[in-house]
Amino acid sequence: MNRANSLLLKTLLPVAIGLAVVVWLFASEFDIADWKRIPWNLHTILAIGAAWLFMAGREAGLAWRFRCMTDRDLSWKQAIKVTMLCEFTSAITPTTAGGSALSMVFMNREGISGGRATTLMMCTLFLDEAFFVVMCPVIFLLVPSSVLFGFDTGSVGSGIRWAFWAVYCGIVLWTLLLFAGIFLRPHKVGEWLTRLFRLKWLRRWEEDIAGIAHSMVTTSEEIKTRSWKWWTEAIAATVTSWVSRYLVVNALFIAFATGASQLVVFARQFVVWTLLTVSPTPGGSGVSEWLFTAYYGDLISDASVALVIAICWRIITYYVYLATGALMIPSWVKQGVRNHHKQ
């Protein structure tokens, strides 16, 4: 019962935070006249439908990655199940924790051995971080910094700019550490991390870091046997999943704000998701809604329309996972109980 109550609280907390921010934004920015000017026609409906299709593409990309990285040992149904459970855990935990760490638990439940599942978890983590590292120079080659961060000349604009570069530098360092730990010197990196987190002010994470250090060694031994074809498919699936997630907002802008530059909309999604990797709230609740309306406001003529797009975006990319996960978790727990009794 306590576990059920804890899960219910973790599910309702991000919803409450998100709704509180939405109510505040509605009270301060929503104008019914702007809402009435939105043309609810076939064009709008088709564009919203495209946004849902792009989100399905995101899940297909992640499921494809689980399939290829497990050498097709996971069926499509199992891969989609693991994907949705990962998305649910991401939705109810701070984005700094994320759902990737639990993917090994979900894969293990579907028949992948614990050691192998740990290896695959480390690889997916590395691929996601590497995507951000590589995409940054590409984005800034296509869209100048003045356009990405020129939406506000005050403290909000400069704050987002500095926060982005701070987070991006952190991602680069973390990715380099993962690369060295997985591909180059896993034992040395593991020893260094273990010693570092024995320091008094870092000791609270010592146990977690010890687990990561051990996973790096295990992953390094497993990865050496992998072919370029395996890596190419995993990279393609990673790119598909992230690009599809970005394109959700492009489709929503086509629905509600056709005058905005689609390239700028796409590029700003990279900034948004980079910042959300360090959100302290579950699934970025509250932070996402505010950040979206503030950051995209200059591309939309009416603040009310920006709020409508933000809400649609969060429903498609977040709240649907809370609902789906809440439906899937009970059967997943029952399956674990049955497996335990069989043993």
Describe these PLM feature segments:
Residues K77-E87, R116, L263-T274, S304-C312:
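Alpha-helical transmembrane segments of multi-pass membrane proteins
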Residues A60-L85, L252-R268:
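Membrane-embedded helical hairpins/re-entrant loop segments and their flanking transmembrane helices
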Residues D208-F256, A260-Q262:
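Alpha-helical transmembrane segments and their immediate interhelical loop/hinge regions
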Residues M1-R37, T89-W201, T281, S285-Q343:
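Transmembrane helix-loop-helix hairpins in multi-pass inner-membrane proteins
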Residues V82-F88, E191-M216:
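Juxtamembrane inter-helical linkers in multi-pass membrane proteins
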